[in-house]
Structures are given as C-alpha cells and as structure tokens.
Swiss-Prot record:
This is 2,4-dinitroanisole O-demethylase subunit alpha. Zn(2+) 2 binds at D105, H225, C247. It catalyses: 2,4-dinitroanisole + H2O = 2,4-dinitrophenol + methanol + H(+). Signal peptide: none annotated. Induction: Constitutively expressed. It comes from Nocardioides sp. (strain JS1661). Belongs to the metallo-beta-lactamase superfamily.
Length: 328
C-alpha cells in the first residue's frame, strides 16, 4: 500500500492515523501503513500457516470460526493477515486470538486484525506486561492461564499451550499439536542467527528451557519467522547457539576487546566459520553480532532477576494435565 502524507491547512503534515504502538513521534509512520502480501498454506489437520516471507504464524480452523495466533508486526500487516483469513475462511470469523508473547511485532495490533474477537488468550505473564504497557493497537488479554501446560479445546479444535519458562520476551508460549505431531513457537528457534540480537533473549535460560520441547512427540516445527524445520534442524539451531556461547567465552579468555567489533568478528570467523559459515542462513550478517551480545552478557551479568529465574532441564512429556474449555 502506498502512503501519502496529507497536509493540513496550516501547511504541516498530518499525523498518520494508524495505531502506533509505543512510537511517540510526530508525523506519519509509513512502515506501519505498508500492507505486505501474505501466503496461506496448510500445515496439518485443521492448521494453516500464514507468512509475509519473514514473519510467520498459525490459524486454526474451528467448526464455526477461526482461532488465530498473534496479530503480525504492524497495522498494515495485521490488516493483510485479516484479509488472508477472510479469503480462506469467508464464512468463519476470527473469534479467538492466542498471544504467544508480549512483543509488539507479534501481538501488537489486534485492534487492526480482529477488534471484534470474542476472546484473547495469553499466559498471565504476557497479559501483565501488555496491561501495563498500554500500547496503541495492542488489545489486552481477556482470558489468562498460568503454569507450564494447558490443554485447549475451542470450537472443535484441540491443542496444547506450553510455557517452558523464560526464553525470549515475557511468557513466550509454544503451541503443540499432539495428534498432528507438530510444534509452533515464535522467536526462539528458526534457521540461522538472524534475530537473536533482540535484547531480551534470556541467555541463561532460553536454550535449556526451549530444549525441553524435544521431550514431546513431534517431527515438524513451524517457527515465527522464515520456513518450517524438521526436528533435526530444530536441534541444529541449539548446536549453533552452544557454539556461539563457547566462542564468546573463548574471546573473553583470549582478551578480545569487546569494544572493537572488527576484532570480535575476526575471532568469530576463526572459531565458527568452518563448522557453521557455509550452512547457516545469514551467518555473515549476524554471527559476530551474537558473539558480541554473549560477551556483553557474560561481562555484565545479564538481565538481572529475569535472566536468573529458575529453569529446568527436564524434558516435557506428551501428557495433558490441565484443560481449558471454551464457551464458544
């Protein structure tokens, strides 16, 4: 969608009327108005995946309506997400939104996507951040859950929500479909090191907590970015991050100057290029940045209490201890 800045009678540019998240600036936000094209593809069973080529999410077809996961990253992409679902399910409105975590680029624009949804379900940790933030366009949760696991039965669809502990963002929740044997999670595992530079990756706990999901029975992983992965590709991402952390520690031991990125990059290539460089998506762009991020973590001690919450090495098992029914 093209964006045109309208001018008021006084000659000054009018402020864009789209939802603005927490961007507190005067003038239009053209990036938020842009409406990227969307691709909708079947996954397994009742589940579909929708992507703009970078961001990816799920929609679950119910008997009478649609259960949508997240809202996409901007007002424009949220509107396109809505249109994609309307095109594929013209007689089934979105009645439920499930939030994976609090970040605005995934759950920030429900007001543009499905303002009339009957319910928005989120982990209580996610819901608390959203309520306190009061971001323009991010709708508050109407139903919350707590703990690690919740079986969900909504409108004929059944799946499980799993909060493995602190990983990235707040309350980041995986969706597990035991009958279809696949898993979805936003912003933790995907091909390459692309976005793990985002500040609130909790380096102490995110790898052991996310690894717990390997205890479940699944062979397909749908990430919140880029393309689907096999179970082996999911495991390979941890190998990359274990090597990244080890490289950062070795760099500190070797006296590499944390303030000299050229030296950090040189050290990263010496240690990681041979095993990972040619087979890792966007390695050249992000590998050294992530080594630097780990170095800062080790040097500063991390994110305080958030980075030192207890975590578990106990794998999840395919059991369903708690159930959430739906009034729908």
């Amino acid at each position: 969608m093209s964006v045109t800045s309208q001018t008021s009678s006084s000659g000054s540019a009018a402020v864009s009327d789209c939802h603005r998240g927490i961007i507190d600036i005067s003038g239009p936000v053209p990036g938020y108005e842009w409406e990227p094209s969307m691709t909708t593809e079947p996954v397994r069973g009742r589940v579909w995946t929708i992507t703009d080529g970078v961001f990816r999410t799920l929609a679950i077809e119910g008997d009478t309506g649609v259960i949508a996961v997240d809202t996409f990253w901007s007002p424009g992409s949220a509107r396109q997400y809505r249109r994609a679902l309307q095109s594929h399910f013209p007689r089934k409105p979105v009645h439920t939104i499930i939030y994976t975590h609090d970040h605005l680029d995934h759950t920030g624009f429900g007001a543009d996507f499905a303002p009339d949804a009957d319910q928005i379900l989120a982990h209580e940790l996610t819901a608390e951040v959203i309520a306190r933030r009061s971001s323009d366009g991010q709708l508050p949760a109407t139903r919350t859950w707590s703990g690690e696991r919740l079986e969900v039965s909504i409108d004929g669809a059944e799946f499980e929500l799993i909060y493995p502990g602190p990983t990235h963002g707040t309350g980041n929740t995986a969706l597990y479909f035991p009958n279809e044997r696949f898993l979805y999670m936003a912003d933790t595992v995907f091909t390459g090191p692309t976005y793990n530079i985002v500040p609130d990756f909790l380096w102490t706990s995110w790898i052991p907590n996310t690894r717990r999901l390997l205890g479940l029975d699944w062979d397909l992983y749908v990430p919140g970015h880029f393309w689907r992965l096999s179970r082996r590709e999911f495991e390979a991402d941890f190998e990359l991050w274990d090597a990244t952390a080890a490289c950062a520690l070795d760099a500190l031991r070797a006296g590499v100057d944390i303030d000299n990125f050229a030296d950090v990059k040189k050290f990263t290539y010496e240690r990681m290029d041979e095993p990972f460089g040619s087979r890792t998506f966007r390695f050249d762009e992000f590998a050294a940045i992530n080594v630097l991020t780990h170095m800062v973590h080790y040097q500063t001690g991390g994110w305080g209490l958030r980075d030192y919450e207890p975590y578990s090495n106990e794998p999840f098992k395919t059991t369903l201890p708690q159930r959430l029914g739906s009034p729908l």
